[in-house]
């Protein structure tokens, strides 16, 4: 069983390794968690290795076990999605990226897909222009951020809300207005994570 700190370190290693393809160095872990020396980080890494969670890549780097790395899969990216004014959704996958669902504690990767964000209507939710929104095909709840098809013509990424019992799409930027569907709103995916590509 892992301690809370060990879980945090393992999650950080997963995140970095998923984004870069290589795990962080011991010094990077030290800086990220604010340790005064590398020894504190090393103690946690050795403990994780004893528990079968990590293996030592070289003298300064500890990575995920091969079995966990092999859990990565190709996340389909279905074109672009506007985070400002809605526009037509592209139907064919634009690209695929190697993705580790364990980063977001997800167990059903076959339900996942991604869309690239364009615009600034979700900046208060820290979703920026150029990021990849990771979405899961499942039922949405009020308050979820969703990819939604509006009136069978336009797709956008917004927060789902209800006004007088009717669904609306709420931006996370005060400069944008609510989107109120005239006829139909189809939830295409629920936002479950972000792969940051934009500069922060």
From Swiss-Prot:
Catalytic activity: Hydrolysis of Ala-|-Gly bond in repressor LexA
Enzyme class: hydrolase
GO biological process, one term: SOS response
EC code: 3.4.21.88
Record's keyword terms, sorted: DNA damage, DNA repair, DNA replication, DNA-binding, Hydrolase, Repressor, SOS response, Transcription, Transcription regulation
Site feature (Cleavage) residues: 83-84
InterPro entries with a match to the protein in the record: LexA, LexA-like, LexA/Signal_pep-like_sf, LexA_DNA-bd_dom, LexA_repressor, Peptidase_S24_S26A/B/C, WH-like_DNA-bd_sf, WH_DNA-bd_sf
Protein family according to the UniProt entry: Belongs to the peptidase S24 family.
Function comment: Binds a consensus sequence 5'-TGTTC-N(4)-GAACA-3'; some genes have a tandem consensus sequence and their binding is cooperative. Binds to the promoters of a number of genes, including lexA and splB. Represses a number of genes involved in the response to DNA damage (SOS response).
NCBIfam families according to UniProt: lexA
Protein name: LexA repressor
């Amino acid at each position: 069983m892992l301690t809370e700190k060990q879980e945090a370190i393992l999650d950080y290693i997963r995140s970095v390794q998923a984004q870069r393809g290589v795990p962080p160095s011991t010094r990077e872990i030290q800086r990220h968690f604010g340790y005064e020396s590398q020894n504190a980080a090393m103690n946690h890494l050795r403990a994780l290795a004893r528990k079968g969670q990590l293996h030592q890549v070289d003298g300064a780097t500890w990575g995920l076990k091969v079995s966990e790395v092999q859990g990565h899969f190709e996340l389909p990216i279905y074109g672009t999605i506007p985070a400002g004014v809605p526009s037509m959704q592209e139907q064919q996958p634009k690209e695929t990226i190697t993705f580790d669902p364990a980063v977001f504690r997800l167990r059903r990767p076959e339900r996942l897909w991604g869309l690239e964000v364009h615009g600034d209507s979700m900046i208060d939710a820290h979703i920026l222009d150029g990021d990849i929104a990771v979405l899961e095909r499942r039922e949405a709840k009020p308050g979820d951020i969703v990819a939604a098809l509006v009136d069978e013509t336009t797709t956008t990424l917004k927060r789902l809300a209800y006004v007088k019992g009717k669904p609306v799409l709420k931006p996370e930027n005060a400069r944008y207005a609510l989107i109120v569907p005239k006829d139909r709103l189809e939830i295409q995916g629920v936002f479950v994570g972000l792969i940051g590509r934009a500069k922060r």
